[in-house]
Curated annotation (Swiss-Prot):
Residues 44-262 form the Radical SAM core domain. Homodimer. HAMAP family: BioB. Pathway: Cofactor biosynthesis; biotin biosynthesis; biotin from 7,8-diaminononanoate: step 2/2. Catalyzes the conversion of dethiobiotin (DTB) to biotin by the insertion of a sulfur atom into dethiobiotin via a radical-based mechanism. Gene3D superfamilies: Aldolase class I. This is Biotin synthase. Keywords: 2Fe-2S, 4Fe-4S, Biotin biosynthesis, Iron, Iron-sulfur, Metal-binding, S-adenosyl-L-methionine, Transferase. [2Fe-2S] cluster binds at C103, C134, C194, R266. Its cofactor is [4Fe-4S] cluster; [2Fe-2S] cluster. SUPFAM superfamilies: Radical SAM enzymes (SSF102114). GO terms for biological process: biotin biosynthetic process. It catalyses: (4R,5S)-dethiobiotin + (sulfur carrier)-SH + 2 reduced [2Fe-2S]-[ferredoxin] + 2 S-adenosyl-L-methionine = (sulfur carrier)-H + biotin + 2 5'-deoxyadenosine + 2 L-methionine + 2 oxidized [2Fe-2S]-[ferredoxin]. The lineage of its organism: Bacteria, Pseudomonadati, Pseudomonadota, Gammaproteobacteria, Pseudomonadales. The gene is bioB.
Length: 351
């Protein structure tokens, strides 16, 4: 094996090392990932979160994968920021169906001064229910980050999406360094980080490895690493992107597990398209977190009862809140708003 299964925490991974992990025989890679996983987690427990879109559509960013972008005509109905009481009602529903974390996402480049008081009240209200809280609101400045931390926010999601080299092909309205700066503000404020990326945007193996290197070589590993499979949405520039090979997706999860052994690896956007066998293989590769409920943020997600039925067949138990924590991923939020059920507010992603 090309990396130690003892999985001491490292922050100095090289491209050659990570590519060597990717290209080793599939069974060897999965064995290594499962060995690392068992050294740090109960292999038969998966963390469960629920994700709610608190403000949908009309985002000024031009992310080519995202149906929420105001640059593309995807038929998505725009919505204003939800009222605080509505958010709290949805959080209560999430707790009732077994979620331990409630993740709130807004389609913003960054939160405005007029919206921040409402966002802070949402955090306080959800926290008072005994749920862990997470948000993805776009870029933050230092004052906003500190205000969220003071309100009790546990996790902040801000995805890197892809490698620095490929990033400019996907997004031009926010720089990679701005994303890294937001993550630094979040960490400095004492909150936990959720950050990952998306497969299927035309990136190379070097780009996939490069994304994981960026995450693993941060001063502290993200507590949650969502790995998303592109959900292709009509009207976005990536609607005709080439499909991701399922084995390549599983390899990405396995390498993420090896590089960041103590992080929750979330099986995120795109799970609706995965059959049960692929999801089971994902859990074996080290994925130990999913989003649970009706939807991703704007894309379909397996129904909650189907998730629990699969868990039962695999002998997997939902992770209790006290045991570990994970976080929401923004790519899920940004990743697709295709089958919007008017009667439901939940959006799920999995990782």
């Amino acid at each position: 094996m090309s990396a130690s299964t003892t999985a001491t925490l490292r922050h100095d991974w090289t491209l050659a090392e990570v590519k060597a992990l990717f290209v080793q025989p599939f069974n060897d890679l999965l064995f290594q990932a499962q060995t690392v996983h068992r050294a740090h987690f109960d292999a038969n427990r998966v963390q469960v979160s629920t994700l709610l879109s608190i403000k949908t559509g009309a985002c000024p960013e031009d992310c080519k994968y995202c149906p929420q972008s105001g640059h593309y005509n995807t038929g998505l109905e725009k919505e204003k920021l939800l009222e605080v009481q509505k958010v709290l009602e949805e959080a209560a529903r999430a707790k009732a169906i077994g979620s331990t974390r409630f993740c709130m996402g807004a389609a913003w480049k960054h939160p405005s001064a007029k919206d921040m008081p409402y966002v802070l009240e949402m955090v306080k209200g959800v926290k008072a229910m005994g749920l862990e809280t997470c948000m993805t609101l776009g870029r933050l400045d230092q004052d906003q980050t500190e205000a969220l931390a003071k309100a009790g926010l546990d996790y902040y999601n801000h995805n890197l999406d892809t490698s620095p080299e490929f990033y400019g092909n996907i997004i031009t309205t926010r720089t990679y360094s701005e994303r890294l700066q937001t993550l630094a503000y979040v960490r400095d404020a004492g909150m936990k980080i959720c950050s990952g990326g998306i497969l299927g945007m035309g990136e190379s193996l070097d780009d996939r490895a490069g994304l994981l290197i960026q995450l693993a070589n941060l001063p502290e590993h993200p507590e949650s690493v969502p790995i998303n499979m592109l959900v292709k949405v009509a009207g976005t520039p990536l609607e005709n992107a080439e499909e991701v090979d399922p084995f390549d997706f599983i390899r990405m999860l396995a390498v993420a597990r090896i590089l960041m052994p103590q992080s929750h690896v979330r099986l995120s956007a795109g799970r609706e398209a995965m059959n049960e066998q692929m999801q089971a293989l994902a859990f074996f590769a080290g994925a130990n977190s999913i989003f649970y409920g009706d939807k991703l943020l704007t894309t379909a997600n397996p129904q909650a009862d189907k998730d629990m039925q699969l868990f039962a067949r695999l002998g997997i138990q939902p992770e209790a809140r006290e045991e570990h924590a994970d976080e929401v991923h923004q790519a899920a939020i940004e990743q697709a708003l295709v089958e919007q059920k008017s009667s439901e507010q939940f959006y799920n992603a999995a990782v």
